[in-house]
């Protein structure tokens, strides 16, 4: 009888441990989602100039009282076929809310390891500005393909939509309070709205559905310095990678 009681107590204890552990995981997942909601709720912003009127949604660091801040937007697509260089194309814009001016650059990069295994980059940048929600090169570009890519470029923030974020379940959750840093990874399907939008705009050489990674640093309450990035990973292997990354950051302006 005593053995039976001990066995029952052991099972109850094990059940409690599993329940508490699962509960902590769910709690962290909910907090990570909530920390991203303030940023992702802004998607999509079809007219980027609307960001001139948007104030910071969470405190990242102390701002000068005369500084309205600067938005930094970045989107890039990277593909690497087996045995080839990692080819990256993307754009970064700096939107100064004080001067209501936007400048940045479009970039093309090919990264390949040398004989010693060290990555060698070959990045080319093309300076741009934005006027009336249009991206315009600030220097002459002889390559017609690059010029067209710049003119047709759209940031993920302009077409992405995370209204179904709450429906993403059973994420792979990671949290390090020492840094602090956190992430949530979800397996998506090809029927996901954002996946369809990416396939519509990019030549993605795989039919595999991607994993969505939400990663950030700083306090989960969004009250400290940090960043938040979004990444869609279609393929992640040695010498073979396909991913899309996006970031929207608000920070103090360098020139007030």
UniProtKB/Swiss-Prot annotation:
**Any single GO CC term annotated in Swiss-Prot or TrEMBL for this entry:** plasma membrane
The yes or no answer to whether the keyword Lipoprotein is present is: yes
Q: Domain of life here? A: Bacteria
Entry-linked PROSITE patterns: PROKAR_LIPOPROTEIN (PS51257)
The UniProt record lists lipidation (S-diacylglycerol cysteine) at 24
Location(s), subcellular: Cell membrane
| Lipid-binding residues (covalent, N-palmitoyl cysteine) | 24
Q: Which InterPro entries match?
A: Csa, Csa_sf
Q: Which UniProt keywords apply?
A: Cell membrane, Lipoprotein, Membrane, Palmitate, Signal
State the Gene3D superfamilies in the record: 2.50.20.40
> From which residue to which does the signal peptide run?
1-23
- Broad class of where this protein is predominantly found: membrane
Membrane-protein topology: Lipid-anchor
Q: Which family does it belong to?
A: Belongs to the staphylococcal tandem lipoprotein family.
Q: What is this protein called?
A: Uncharacterized lipoprotein SACOL0081/SACOL0082
Question: What's the source species' lineage?
Answer: Bacteria, Bacillati, Bacillota, Bacilli, Bacillales
């Amino acid at each position: 009888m005593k053995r039976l009681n001990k066995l029952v107590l052991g099972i109850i204890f094990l059940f409690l441990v599993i329940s508490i552990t699962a509960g902590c995981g769910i709690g962290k997942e909910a907090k990570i989602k909530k920390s991203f909601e303030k940023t992702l709720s802004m998607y999509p912003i079809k007219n980027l100039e609307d960001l001139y009127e948007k104030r910071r949604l969470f405190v990242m660091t102390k701002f000068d009282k005369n500084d309205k801040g600067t938005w930094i937007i970045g989107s890039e697509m990277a593909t690497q076929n087996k045995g080839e260089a990692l080819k990256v194309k993307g754009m970064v814009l700096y939107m100064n809310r004080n001067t209501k001016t936007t400048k940045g650059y479009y970039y093309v990069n090919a990264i390949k390891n040398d004989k010693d295994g060290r990555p060698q980059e070959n990045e080319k940048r093309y300076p741009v500005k934005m006027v009336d929600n249009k991206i315009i090169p600030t220097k002459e570009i002889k390559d017609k393909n690059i010029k067209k890519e710049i003119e047709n470029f759209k940031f993920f923030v302009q077409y992405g939509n995370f209204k179904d974020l709450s429906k993403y379940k059973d994420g792979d959750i990671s949290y390090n309070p020492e840094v602090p840093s956190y992430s949530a990874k979800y397996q998506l399907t090809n029927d996901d709205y954002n996946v369809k939008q990416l396939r519509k705009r990019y030549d993605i050489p795989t039919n595999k559905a991607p994993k969505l990674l939400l990663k950030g640093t700083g306090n989960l309450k969004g009250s400290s310095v940090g960043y938040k990035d979004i990444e869609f990973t279609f393929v992640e292997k040695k010498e073979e990678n396909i991913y899309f990354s996006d970031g929207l950051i608000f920070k103090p302006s360098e020139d007030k």
